[in-house]
Amino acid sequence: MTVYNFNAGPAILPPSVLSQAQEELRDFAGTGISVMETSHRAKEFEAVNNEVEARFKALLGIESGYRVLLLQGGASTQFAMIPMNFLGADQVADYIITGTWAEKARDEAQKIGKVHIAATTEAENHNRIPSQTELQFSENPVYVHLTTNNTIYGTQWQSTPETNGVPIVADMSSDIFSRPFDASKFGLVYAGAQKNLGPSGVTVVLIREDWLDKGAKNVPTMLRYSTHAKNNSLYNTPPTFGVYMLNLVLAWIQEQGGLAGMAEYNTRKANVVYNAIDNSGGFYRGHAVADSRSQMNVTFNLPTQELEKQFLAEAKAQGMIGLPGHRSVGGVRASIYNAMSIEGVEALASFMAHFAAKQG
């Protein structure tokens, strides 16, 4: 039986990447040892480390002005690290609240400095993305923080908002490299790797080089971006296997036609599942309003909790795992990140149609 992995993260990885990692597991780059045994100072690993930054920039079409850092601690550490470095005592940062992870980022920033809420969709249980006209920025924010995709609620920014020239800081953990984006609008982008870029354990940061000089100097060494930039992300021992896997995934994305190719593929996949919802006669109810729907996380409910439990049990029995929704929304969540195949979403849509038909 084929198993389709709809987990929200750690999530599905490209089968070809797993096969390559399997082949090289005991002999990395002709060394005769595993990458997990290789010194992070070895030239073979440093080559991988450098390849990651080169591939990352190539996919975005940028040659200079930015650094790619490979950190640890997940996006949750970034929630605090960003304001520690860039939110001064007499400054304000604007936060747009579209879900749980944006709330967590705001909470950490409030411990460090002044935070202004530019918009929030909390009253609607975060079922949509605020419109441009709803955004009320403070007079002179040092940055505007947003979460580009909301895994729990199944919403996603369809375009980058205008911020009057203020740099955007974005948590892209769940949709990074699922589509192109204009790096010039961002001062800093961060993402845990475990949804679209590889296994858990690596946090990727794209940061403008001029921001490296702006960082506070009284921040502990490991929490300064400049520390990691100066040391090529090798200040301390990195998660070498995670970095190696990240490099393989980036190469795979390039092979799929880059970010434009991924965007086209992800749109096709998402449409398959959303069509199953929209054509169900109301049996399936999407949580997100139509113009805020995520292409990465499709969230929906059934008429009763009992039917939801039955749906999840039968889907699992047919090889579709990781579908239970987050407790904040309940129901079903299908995470269809870059590596999810079109066959996977078609299997889910077919199951959805048959399940609804059985209920009469």
Curated annotation (Swiss-Prot):
One of its GO terms (cellular component) is cytoplasm. GO terms for biological process: L-serine biosynthetic process; pyridoxine biosynthetic process. It catalyses: O-phospho-L-serine + 2-oxoglutarate = 3-phosphooxypyruvate + L-glutamate; 4-(phosphooxy)-L-threonine + 2-oxoglutarate = (R)-3-hydroxy-2-oxo-4-phosphooxybutanoate + L-glutamate. Binds 1 pyridoxal phosphate per subunit. One of its GO terms (molecular function) is O-phospho-L-serine:2-oxoglutarate aminotransferase activity. It is found in: Cytoplasm. L-glutamate binds at R41. Belongs to the class-V pyridoxal-phosphate-dependent aminotransferase family. SerC subfamily. This is Phosphoserine aminotransferase.
